[in-house]
UniProtKB/Swiss-Prot annotation:
Native organism: Lawsonia intracellularis (strain PHE/MN1-00)
Cysteine pairs bridged by disulfides in the record: none
Protein name: UPF0173 metal-dependent hydrolase LI0883
PANTHER family reported for this sequence: UPF0173 METAL-DEPENDENT HYDROLASE MJ1163 (PTHR43546:SF3), UPF0173 METAL-DEPENDENT HYDROLASE MJ1163-RELATED (PTHR43546)
One Pfam family hit: Lactamase_B_3
Organism placement in taxonomy: Bacteria, Pseudomonadati, Thermodesulfobacteriota, Desulfovibrionia, Desulfovibrionales
GO molecular function: hydrolase activity
């Protein structure tokens, strides 16, 4: 069965496979690139948060409280969410999990990875996610490039990577293209661009760098509020 990727803009992705839906960095309210409210999307089974900046944490608490979706996040950020009203029983592990840890819920296998960024609570993180149909993808959250991406490329058969290219707060197009090379992913979708004026406004430079650095990696063109079947 195919995997459907929905991009709600910025770093907000929804991945659907075998009747299970995983939502990552659910930034809907005040997202200038998103045309839907959080209560208009398909009900997620799992919500993953990479870090607690408002453009990533987004509407996670409201979504989980309304839908009963499980929330995956790092220890520390879990405490912050609980203090802000997230029901503790919806937090995976009730206290969160941590970098290097792997959990499995609802047929989805999720490994938390490090990211190089900042967070007001806990540490910034990424996720390597294997859906129930064995489709494996990598969402690093906000990050700069780092050498361990090469290790991820050796350890995991990555069908897809979702890579930030905006620069300023994360790696830019040039670095992200080399990250795709290190990750050895079969496909890549650029993210974290065009949302705010300070970010890279189009993915064209990334597309060109990718062709030069990792020609074996397929570039998947997406615009916010669209979906792709892979």
């Amino acid at each position: 069965m195919n995997t459907t990727i929905i991009w709600h803009g910025h770093s907000n992705f929804q991945i659907n496979a075998n009747g299970i839906s995983v939502l990552i960095d659910p930034f809907f309210t005040n997202n200038p690139r998103c045309t839907k409210n959080w209560n208009e999307i398909q009900k997620p089974d799992i919500v993953l948060i990479t870090h607690d900046h408002s453009d990533h944490l987004g509407d996670a608490i409201a979504i989980c409280k309304s839908t009963g979706a499980l929330c995956g996040c790092i220890v520390g950020t879990a405490d912050k969410l609980i203090q802000q009203g997230m029901p503790q029983h919806l937090i995976i592990g009730e206290i969160g999990f941590n970098i290097g840890g792997t959990i499995e819920r609802k047929g989805v296998r999720i490994t938390m990875t490090q990211s190089f960024h900042t967070s007001e609570s806990g540490s910034p993180a990424g996720y390597i996610i294997t859906m129930p149909n064995n489709f494996t993808l990598y969402h690093p959250g906000d990050t700069g490039i780092f050498q361990t991406m090469k290790t991820f490329g050796k350890l995991y058969n990555l069908h897809l990577s979702l890579l930030p290219i905006g620069g300023f707060f994360t790696m830019d197009s040039y670095q992200a293209a080399y990250a795709a090379k290190m990750l050895k992913c079969k496909m890549v979708i650029p993210m974290h661009w065009g949302t705010f004026p300070v970010l890279e406004q189009t993915p064209e430079r990334f597309k060109n760098y990718l062709k030069a650095m990792a020609p074996e990696c397929k570039y998947i063109a997406m615009e916010p509020n669209t979906s792709k079947e892979l």
